[in-house]
Structure formats: C-alpha cells, structure tokens
C-alpha cells in the first residue's frame, strides 16, 4: 500500500507574509499634562539645551572643568524621612567657541515639585548672560554680589523642599475595663480529653503491679456497645447478664481551690442580685467593616493610524503578490509504502483428558481433568494376601465374584452414578461395591454399632491413616475394632452423664440445630446458653473446645480467592479455641463414588488441635456424638459471684466466649485476672490462646 504525504517547508518570503508585520519604531503614547506642568517642562528643557558659557577677566583668569551640582529629590513615601545624598552630577565645561559642540545630557524622568522661590531662581538663571559681569570670587545674593572668597557656592541649587503631609492621628487608646468573670476564669487550668486512645510501646513485663493496683480503683470500665441481655435456654437458668450505660468516675481532691472558685462563679451567675455589667466587661474582638471593592481603571493606549494599518491581519494579501513557482518551490510530495501485518489468531489448547463445564445458574466456568490409574499386579496380590489374613470372610467374598456380577455392577454404575462420579471406574471401586452388596445380604446395619464406612476401611478396601483414640467401655461397643472413629454410640449410656452440664450454642445457627437442641434438653437438666458468637462453630462444649459441623460434598469446593470452602472458618476457630472438633457429614453416594475424599479430608485436617469424625447425614448420629462430647469435656459453672459476672461485658467485647468468661470468674475477679496476666501466671495464661492473649495485653496498655 502506498500513501502520498504533502510536506511544506519554511518559505523564504518576508516576515510580513501571513502574519503581523514587524513595527519599525516604538509605539508612541500620549500623556495629558496640565498647563503648569507644561510650563515647568519647557523651562527645564531650555535650561538643559543651553549650557553655561563662563568667560574670565584678565585678573581672575580662566576656569576649566568646574563642577556644578544639581540635587534631585528622591521618590519617597509620606511616612519616610528624606535623606538626599548627592551622587549624580552634571559637568559644565567652559566652552570658548560659540555652540560648536552641543552636549547631550541624560534626562531624568522624574516629577519635580517647584515652589515660587525656586521659580524665581530658575528665571534668574534663564536671563543670565553668557559672560558674567561680576567677579567670580564674590558671593551672589538675592540683592546683589557680596565679597567672599568661596568657590562658586552660589551656583549650587538649593535643596527642593516638599510640602508637609498631614500627620495620621492614631486611634485613641482607651483603657479597658476590668472584668471579674474574665479574671476568675483565667485562673482555672484547662483540661482536655482526647477523642482517641493510644497504646504504650513498652512491653507488659516492664509494668509495675503496684502502680496498677493504685490506679485501678479510680476508673470503672464499662461496655461501649448497645445494651444486650444473654438469655439461658434451659430450666436451670440462674444468671441474666445486662449491660449498663457508659460512665467515667474521676476523683478530685476536696481542697481544690480552683474548683471552688469555679463553683463560686457559677453561683453568682444564677444570683438575682448579681451585677449584669460584669458581662459587658468581657473582652470582645473589634468588628471590621468590609472594604469596598476597588474598580480597576484600565489604561487606554492611543495608536497612530499608520500603526493600526500594520496591525491588520491579512495572511493572503502578501502571498498573492508572489509567483506560483516561489510558493511551490518549498512544497514536496513524498510517497511512503507500508504493509499491514495480519494478527495471528491464538486458540486455547484442548486437552483430551479434561472436560470443560459451564454453570448456567452461577455463570461460571470450570474444567475436570480425567485420568486412569493402572493397578500393579504385584501390589494387588500382596494386598489380597493381607486382606485374607485380616478378614477371611470378606477376602473370600471379594475373590469369588463372577463375571455376571461384574457386568451387573458396571451397568448399575453407568446408569445411576454417572452424573455424580468424580473419576473413572477402577478395579478397587468395583470390588468395594460388590463387597458392600454381599455384606448387606448377611448382616444388618442396625444390629451392629459400626457404620458401613468403618467396615470398609477396617477391611482394607481403601487405605486410611490409623489414629488411636482412647475410649471408654461405657461409650463404645468393645467387640469391634475402633481404629476408625465414625461409628454410632448408644443412647442409653450417655443420658446420665450430661446432667447439670453447661454448653453454649451459636445464636446464628439455632434454627439449623433446632432438633439437636430439643433432643438434648428433652430428658436432661442441661444448661444451654445462647451467644451471638462471631465464629462458624455450632456448639461450644467448654471454655477451650467447640464443635463445627461441615459437609463432605462442599469440602473440595473453591472460593473466589482460590482457598477451600472451609479453610477460613477452621483457621478462625483455631485462633479462639485450643481444641476444635469437626463433624464431617457424608452421604451414601459420596461413599460409593469417591472413597478417596475421606483420606484427603483426614490428611488436610491433620492437626494436634483438631479432631475429625465422619458420620452419616442423619440427626440421630449427630445427637449421639454431642452427648458423648458433653459427657467427656463439658463442665458445670455454679461457683461464680454476682460481682464478677457484672464485669463480664469487658471480656465479651474482646471476643471471648461466654464459657471462657465464666471459667475465669470461678477463680479470679476482674482485677485479679488482670494482675495475673501482667505477672504472667501459668494458670491464667493456659486458659487463653495466643490471639486472646495479645488482645488482652493491648487492652492493659491502653492510655489516654
């Protein structure tokens, strides 16, 4: 592709072409002068253009190069004193020839004010002849010449005097009346409370407990948040926490003279016989009037007609006088060739082992990678031998299934479980399904206390990490192996162990756990407290243990930031509790389709402070586990004092749970607990987590 571009270079024409012409001379400005000013200028001009010619007599000789001074007034303001220093001089040369050389003097563009006495002197100088008839050594006065030996002092022009300005009379300085109120209020000290609080940089270990004990009684800490009341949803509710309004107690010495003075002044204000003139003696600022806006008078310049003609802008008037050759001499047309490169279209590579999915409801995209694992023959043989040694019955059943059973199992998988499957069907999954079908024919799940998932894991169908947990015979059925902790427990054993225990329920999840709460409080005297806790836990068993229920189907889901669905909730609970019990609910379909999900959850939640339990999605299993947790870790709180409970709002505002606050007030008061934290006593420190300890230390270092 070729494009033509027209380039215009600088022309060699005159500067007047196409713009303003360069003015040959300076612009003239007309200034209006009065008659008196015109007369003074004429007199000064005639004096400067006619230099003095001084000739000498035979007796006195000639004078060459004598200097005669002309003192000039400096421009000063009305308030400034005039101090004239004679600096610039005019040299008057003795010229013998008649006006052969005319001297050019520098003109001082200053406005001079001449009085009548000085005008007489200028008129005398004008009428002075070129040659002097009187001798030079004589002094000239107004009446004549006097005998004196001075050198030409009479040529010195006297200093021009200026008229005196009017003196600006200052404002009268009136004596101010003394005000009793102003004198009394000025003696008071000003005290201010900042709107924000600060925290000292010193560590808590450098604090002296004696100072804290002395200053603790002077202040009373109150809750800032709006009033709330903590209710007890049980039959044995004994306490009702209520908040009080915010107040500050400041103790002032009784012998404070300044405060007595202020009270005395306030009594005078409400006294009917108090003199009202005292209010008018208070100093007030002087009011200033608004100054009128000065209008700017713009100066008008008068230009001559010739200058106005040159300022007319006609760019084409001069160009028409030039020839075409002169115009197009500096104009060239250049040809440039360029090519357009097409953009390469890039397509996303499609992987043969993945499926791209689109969710029409959530308007999101996703992909699933598909893979097939090839089982090793040696590993399968060793695994079958170990299975036969552990459980002979299950091993015989897994080895005796025929081809018809395999075909039927494949047909069942392809028809019913295909929409929900997560990976390809392998030999391990097929063997697990066949084992489950044959086991259901021989045994019933309701007769045994072991669930189906524990049976599969104990039989060795899919691997799982064995974690030993100490159990008691009163809770579990000791006939079966307890290597995996997702079995149901008996109801009758736990009903007697939860009497007079106290737990807390999260107020945000009361509707979700309504059936569980009704079942726990139905046949037992259990204290149940509702607390609007910020965490995601369902129940709080004691001051350091909570129960959190999650769904196995949502565990591997990702949030918008890329983290797992329950990642943030579990981390927040670990900062507030020393033990977190996680109940994982799963369905029969997930157990059949994706058995690897269980050991992935177990591996991800592998922590010394986290206990994981897998149960079916039924309320009865969850109620049994809650009774077990209450019997094992819950406490009864009956030793609190009413004085200590009144200060519970301070610790609740720090994010502490209600059971932790009641545990603290069983052994400490609020002041004693603060002192124990400052001294870092082990008994008080063990109750709190690291996050709770930092918040409490920050409160203790609070200062105004």
Swiss-Prot record:
Stretches that traverse the bilayer: none
Coiled-coil ranges per UniProt: none
Subcellular location: Nucleus; Chromosome
This protein's UniProt keywords: Cell cycle, Chromosomal rearrangement, Chromosome, Chromosome partition, DNA-binding, Meiosis, Nucleotide-binding, Nucleus
Keyword Cell cycle: yes
Induction: During meiosis.
GO MF, one example: nucleotide binding
Any one Gene Ontology cellular component term annotated for this protein: nucleus
Principal location class: nucleus
Signal peptide: none
GO biological process entries: chromosome segregation; meiotic cell cycle
Family: Belongs to the ZIP2 family.
Subunit structure comment from the entry: Interacts with ZIP3.
Biological function: Required for initiation of meiotic chromosome synapsis. Involved in synaptonemal complex formation, a structure that tethers a pair of homologous chromosomes along their lengths and plays a central role in recombination and homolog segregation during meiosis. Required for the normal localization of MSH4 to chromosomes.
UniProt name for this protein: Protein ZIP2
Source lineage: Eukaryota, Fungi, Dikarya, Ascomycota, Saccharomycotina
């Amino acid at each position: 592709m070729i494009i033509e571009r027209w380039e215009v270079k600088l022309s060699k024409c005159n500067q007047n072409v196409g713009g303003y012409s360069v003015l040959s001379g300076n612009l003239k400005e007309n200034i209006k002068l009065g008659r008196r000013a015109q007369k003074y200028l004429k007199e000064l001009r005639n004096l400067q253009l006619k230099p003095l010619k001084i000739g000498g007599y035979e007796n006195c000789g000639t004078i060459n190069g004598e200097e005669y001074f002309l003192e000039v007034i400096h421009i000063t303001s009305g308030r400034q004193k005039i101090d004239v220093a004679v600096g610039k001089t005019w040299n008057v040369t003795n010229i013998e020839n008649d006006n052969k050389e005319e001297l050019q003097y520098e003109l001082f563009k200053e406005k001079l004010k001449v009085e009548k006495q000085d005008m007489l002197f200028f008129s005398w100088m004008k009428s002075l002849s070129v040659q002097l008839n009187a001798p030079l050594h004589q002094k000239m006065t107004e009446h004549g010449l006097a005998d004196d030996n001075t050198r030409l002092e009479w040529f010195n022009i006297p200093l021009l005097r200026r008229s005196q300005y009017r003196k600006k009379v200052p404002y009268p300085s009136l004596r101010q009346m003394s005000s009793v109120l102003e004198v009394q209020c000025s003696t008071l000290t000003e005290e201010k409370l900042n709107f924000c609080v600060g925290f000292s940089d010193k560590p808590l270990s450098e604090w002296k407990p004696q100072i804290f004990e002395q200053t603790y009684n002077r202040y009373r800490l109150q809750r800032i948040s709006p009033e709330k009341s903590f209710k007890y949803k049980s039959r044995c509710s004994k306490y009702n926490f209520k908040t009080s309004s915010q107040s500050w107690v400041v103790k002032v010495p009784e012998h404070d003279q300044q405060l007595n003075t202020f009270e005395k002044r306030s009594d005078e204000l409400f006294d009917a016989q108090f003199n009202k003139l005292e209010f008018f003696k208070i100093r007030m600022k002087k009011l200033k009037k608004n100054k009128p806006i000065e209008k700017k008078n713009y100066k008008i310049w008068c230009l001559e007609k010739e200058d106005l003609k040159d300022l007319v802008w006609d760019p084409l008037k001069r160009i028409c006088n030039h020839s075409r050759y002169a115009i197009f001499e500096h104009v060239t047309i250049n040809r440039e060739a360029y090519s357009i490169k097409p953009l390469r279209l890039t397509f996303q590579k499609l992987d043969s082992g993945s499926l791209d999915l689109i969710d029409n409801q959530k308007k999101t995209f996703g992909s699933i990678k598909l893979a097939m694992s090839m089982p090793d023959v040696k590993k399968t043989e060793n695994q079958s031998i170990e299975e036969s040694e552990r459980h002979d019955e299950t091993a015989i059943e897994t080895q005796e299934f025929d081809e018809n059973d395999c075909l039927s199992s494949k047909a069942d998988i392809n028809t019913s479980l295909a929409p929900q499957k997560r990976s390809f069907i392998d030999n391990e999954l097929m063997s697990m399904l066949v084992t489950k079908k044959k086991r259901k024919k021989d045994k019933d799940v309701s007769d045994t206390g072991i669930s189906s998932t524990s049976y599969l894991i104990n039989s060795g169908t899919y691997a799982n990490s064995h974690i030993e947990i100490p159990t008691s015979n009163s809770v579990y059925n000791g006939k079966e192996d307890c290597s995996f902790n997702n079995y149901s427990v008996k109801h009758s054993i736990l009903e007697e162990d939860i009497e007079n225990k106290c737990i807390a329920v999260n107020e945000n999840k009361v509707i979700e756990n309504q059936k569980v709460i009704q079942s726990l409080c139905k046949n037992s005297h259990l204290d149940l407290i509702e607390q609007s806790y910020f965490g995601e836990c369902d129940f709080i068993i004691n001051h350091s243990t909570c129960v959190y229920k999650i769904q196995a189907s949502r565990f591997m889901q990702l949030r918008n930031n890329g983290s797992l669905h329950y990642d943030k909730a579990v981390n927040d609970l670990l900062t507030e509790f020393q033990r977190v019990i996680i109940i994982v609910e799963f369905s029969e379909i997930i157990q059949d389709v994706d058995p690897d999900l269980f050991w992935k959850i177990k591996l991800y939640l592998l922590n010394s402070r986290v206990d994981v339990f897998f149960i079916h999605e039924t309320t009865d299993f969850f109620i049994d586990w809650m009774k077990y947790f209450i019997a094992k870790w819950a406490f009864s709180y009956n030793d609190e004092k009413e004085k200590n409970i009144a200060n519970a709002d301070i610790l609740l505002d720090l994010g502490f749970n209600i059971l932790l606050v009641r545990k603290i007030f069983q052994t400490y008061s609020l002041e004693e607990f603060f002192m124990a934290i400052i001294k870092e006593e082990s008994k008080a420190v063990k109750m709190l987590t690291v996050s709770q300890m930092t918040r409490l230390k920050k409160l203790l270092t609070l200062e105004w």
